[in-house]
Regions:
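Short, Lys/Arg-enriched N-terminal segments with co-localized hydrophobic residues
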Residues: 1-23
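A C-terminal junction/extension of Radical SAM enzymes
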Residues: 171-240
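Local cysteine-cluster metal-coordination motifs and their immediate loop/turn environment
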Residues: 245, 249-264
Length: 265
């Protein structure tokens, strides 16, 4: 494909200059869900590529994705907890995966869809829930994370009478991390598991420590990989490239109302 460096307003005002050249812009939807907030559609033309992260591959979203098929990578979030007290207004994993199959049938490239099991609760029950998604998924490229138990998340869990997975701690115990590593080691070695900011899970043969925006994404979008750099850090151990730019402006929980959401509002 023909690649153009561009200077525009809005999203692209964040272009940075390295060595006299403008960096590319890869838009991403981490601050909300693009199946609810469609404001991202007005920004696609100002991006070189877009990574959509959604818990609901709805028919309306599929229609929009197909309009920008050459620019989009889809992360279809599917934890297996949809429709439960933890994700009360999220579609079930069966429905979400059926919608992924519908998108594939519409002609969207399989190599630009990742099933995002984000988060996983590393308990026996939590790993069983994640395994159901893995077994049923038509896509065997996954991005995974463990649940971050922020204080406000623990408070929500208590209000909903959900057992705290790590007691009063933020992250899993070493025993829980070990259980998850053993679970990953038992997976089909042909499956791909990507992690970002999860150093406890890196190092296994089928696990790649790779940013949510990475040179792998750049190549899948047929963009040049020479003039990209790491540095899109959002937190400790983040591996994202500096060309990552948020497309949504929500700073509160969306209407899916997930109990583990990092937004306090």
């Amino acid at each position: 494909s023909i690649y153009k460096w561009r200077i525009t307003n809005s999203v692209c005002k964040s272009h940075q200059i390295y060595g006299g050249m403008l960096t590319m812009i890869i838009g991403i939807t981490e601050s909300g869900d693009p199946s609810i907030d469609f404001s991202w559609t007005s920004k696609v033309d100002n991006c070189d590529g877009v990574i959509l992260i959604t818990k609901n591959v709805s028919d309306k979203l599929i229609s929009q994705i197909m309009k920008y098929i050459d620019k989009i990578i889809l992360h279809a979030t599917c934890t297996g907890m949809g429709g439960t007290i933890i994700e009360p207004y999220v579609p079930t994993y069966e429905h979400q995966l059926a919608q992924v199959s519908k998108l594939l049938a519409a002609g969207f490239p399989k190599d630009r869809i990742i099933v995002r099991i984000d988060p996983i609760i590393p308990t026996t029950e939590g790993l069983h829930t994640a395994q159901k998604v893995i077994d049923a998924s038509p896509i065997k490229h996954f991005r995974i994370s463990v649940l971050d138990a922020y204080p406000h998340v623990r408070s929500r869990f208590k209000t909903l009478n959900i057992p705290l997975p790590y007691d009063e701690k933020f992250q899993p115990s070493e025993e829980q991390f070990h259980m998850m590593r053993m679970w990953l080691a038992r997976q089909n070695m042909n499956y791909i598991f990507d992690v970002c900011a999860e150093p406890h899970l890196a190092g296994l043969p089928n696990v790649r420590a790779i940013g949510c925006v990475s040179d792998d994404d750049i190549m899948r979008l047929n963009l040049p990989v020479n003039n990209i750099s790491i540095g899109g850090y959002q937190r400790k151990d983040c591996l994202c490239l500096s060309c990552k730019h948020e497309l949504l402006s929500n700073k509160k929980r969306c209407s899916y109302n997930c109990a583990y959401c990092y937004w306090k509002g």
